[in-house]
Amino acid sequence: MNIKRRLKYLTSCLLVSAFFWINSSAWAGGPEIPPSAPWVIYLGGFGGIYVANFEYQGTYLGGSFTVPIGSNVHQNGYTAGGHIGLRYYFSNPWFLGLEFAAMGNSENATTAESVLAPSPDDLIFNLVNQFRIKSNLDLTAQLGVNITPQTRVYIKGGASYARIRHILTVFNPATLTPTISLQRTTHKNRWGFLVGFGLGYDFCPWFGIFTEYNYYDYGRVGLDSLSNIRPNNGADTYHQNVRVHAYSVLLGVNLNFSV
């Protein structure tokens, strides 16, 4: 089991264990939750695991033949960012929240394909795609409850705006050492949605920690169609698209300001 899987497994176990422990102690005769300030503004930073899935589809039209291309690859990376938010206790201990977050994400997802003519021995070129969600901006609403004086659980959902980078590279296999005959980098800005849940704990009125799980879905993204991409400059067309979804597991800190 690699480090990222261990971190993901450990974080998930902590989330589940903490939830059930706090839930049992809070509702089984625990201390009465004192009134909270109606409004809480918070600033925070976080880091964690970020995994994006790219379901890539392409169609190569080579004149007299068609080659379908498809693969499913993952961006197994890390993320870091910050957020600012507002909680309103409309009926203590229940609260509504609004939050804006920004984060940057590491690593690439890479797929490599060989484009063949109808004859299995007729290799035309090798095609390599690299994908990466470089960053995303999230605006979410929250519904939560303080289950102890220091602890809260919540669900969240909203909109996410992602910047997706795509690098397409064509290699000419006819040479002794394959050479790059075409390389194209494009960026796509894409709206999507996210849903998630979290657990927060305040050590004192102004400082606390939190952990979250978030799921993102950006749908199917149309990529640029290209012409004449084969190394020998033959007439052809290449159509491509990719479906993008992701998840993150976060751990962070907050500074709280009661209003």
UniProtKB/Swiss-Prot annotation:
Residues 1-28 form the signal peptide. It is found in: Cell membrane. InterPro entries: OMP-like, OMP/PagP_b-brl, OMP_b-brl. It comes from Coxiella burnetii (strain RSA 493 / Nine Mile phase I). GO terms for cellular component: plasma membrane. It is a multi-pass membrane protein. The lineage of its organism: Bacteria, Pseudomonadati, Pseudomonadota, Gammaproteobacteria, Legionellales. It comes from the Bacteria. Keywords: Cell membrane, Membrane, Signal, Transmembrane, Transmembrane helix. This is Uncharacterized protein CBU_1413. The chain crosses the membrane at residues 32-52, 191-211.
